[in-house]
């Protein structure tokens, strides 16, 4: 939109670097190494915001936000037709870490049926289809420009609609099962049950 700036405030901060309580940070300054970013407690947004340009809505996930499937789905629930992930993967070095982040992006594409354009300053950049297929990519510290036709999708998957509800239900069932087992063992030990 001409003349209108759209903002997204990162909603999921990197624990230990972007999200460290000040009392911990002050006490442990001697352990902190400079990774080229901000260290300490920085502000964060509440949820993903979909940007709109020429009638197309994009979900602009920043770095670690792509690790949280339900949070990531917030972009889609707010209308994102495709996702754009920007990331600073440089602090991983040439380790499997940056490759793992790219793989997680593939999982998010499948969960929400959204194509992804991922741009990492030193890590792996590329295009991922809504099925998780990888298109053109640039590898570790590889400079270049890649382009692709990015299909748009407005339909919501079950996971996008309901998020982690199945996982939460499973957690409650497990908790109730453990409590039942403990109560049963207690009653049995005290000869209250035959």
Where are these regions (language model features)?
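Selective detector of the "anchor" transmembrane alpha-helix that sits immediately C-terminal
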Residues: 161-186
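Soluble catalytic domains of enzymes that build or remodel membrane lipids, polysaccharides, and related
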Residues: 1-166
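Short leucine-rich amphipathic alpha-helices used at interfaces
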Residues: 138, 144, 182, 187-188
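Cytoplasmic C-terminal tails of single-pass
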Residues: 191-194
């Amino acid at each position: 939109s001409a003349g209108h700036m759209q903002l997204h405030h990162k909603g999921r901060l990197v624990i230990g670097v972007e999200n460290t309580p000040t009392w911990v940070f002050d006490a442990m300054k001697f352990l902190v190494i400079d990774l080229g970013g901000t260290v300490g407690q920085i502000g964060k947004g509440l949820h993903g915001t979909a940007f709109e340009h020429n009638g197309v809505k994009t979900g602009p996930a920043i770095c670690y936000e792509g690790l949280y499937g339900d949070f990531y789905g917030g972009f889609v629930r707010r209308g994102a037709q495709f996702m754009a992930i920007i990331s600073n993967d440089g602090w991983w070095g040439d380790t499997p870490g940056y490759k793992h982040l790219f793989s997680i992006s593939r999982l998010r594409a499948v969960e929400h049926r959204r194509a992804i354009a991922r741009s990492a300053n030193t890590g792996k950049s590329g295009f991922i289809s809504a099925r998780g297929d990888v298109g053109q990519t640039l590898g570790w510290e590889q400079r270049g420009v890649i382009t692709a036709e990015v299909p748009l999708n407005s339909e919501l998957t079950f996971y996008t609609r309901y998020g982690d509800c199945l996982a939460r239900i499973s957690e409650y069932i497990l908790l109730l099962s453990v409590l039942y087992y403990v109560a049963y063992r207690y009653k049995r030990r005290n000869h209250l049950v035959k």
